[in-house]
Regions:
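A short helix-loop-beta-strand connector motif used in the catalytic cores of GNAT acetyltransferases and
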Residues: 17-23
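Short beta-strand scaffold segments in enzyme catalytic cores
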Residues: 23-31
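A short, polar/charged loop-to-alpha-helix boundary motif
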Residues: 43-54
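Mobile, glycine- and charge-enriched loop segments
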Residues: 52-76
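Short cysteine clusters
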Residues: 55, 79-82, 86
Length: 145
């Protein structure tokens, strides 16, 4: 398994252990993780702390030229809000663990020039499948339903 996706899965598991939604993300520059995060909507009582947003926040302020050389990894297909952040900061590549349990606007992100790779990783799929089955009400809240 890709080491960076594995790091994102570790973040997702941390979030689950904290009582949150198991989605994780890492930001990679030149083969090094420069930001990592997990969904913290429950833990922080936040409407915006999705994994990707938390990851970008934890990377701190970076020059635009840095984002433009990064790869963002996420265990689940990013939602419209997080996809917007990818486009805003011109992150050129997104690697997603899976999009079977939820699919964000991947085609739109691609149409804006971002290389989107969906791995359909069994661990990512199962982690979300188990969570959705156990906590469907919380999951539906997270995706705005």
């Amino acid at each position: 398994m890709d080491a960076f996706l594995q790091a994102a899965i570790e973040e997702a598991r941390i979030g689950l252990a904290e009582g949150g939604i198991p989605i994780g993300s890492v930001l990679v520059l030149a083969g090094k993780i420069i930001g990592r995060g997990h969904n913290q909507r429950v833990q922080r009582g936040s409407v915006i702390h999705h994994a990707e947003m938390n990851c970008l926040e934890n990377a701190r302020r970076l020059k635009a030229s840095v984002y433009q050389r990064c790869i963002l990894y996420s265990t689940l297909s990013p939602c419209p809000m997080c996809s917007g952040a990818i486009l805003l900061y011109k992150i050129p590549r997104l690697v997603t663990g899976e999009n079977k349990n939820f699919q964000g606007p991947e085609e739109y992100v691609r149409s804006q020039g971002v290389k989107v790779e969906v791995l359909q990783d069994p661990a990512c799929i199962q982690l979300m499948r188990d969570f959705i089955k156990a906590r469907s009400e919380l999951w539906n809240e997270d995706i705005g339903e």
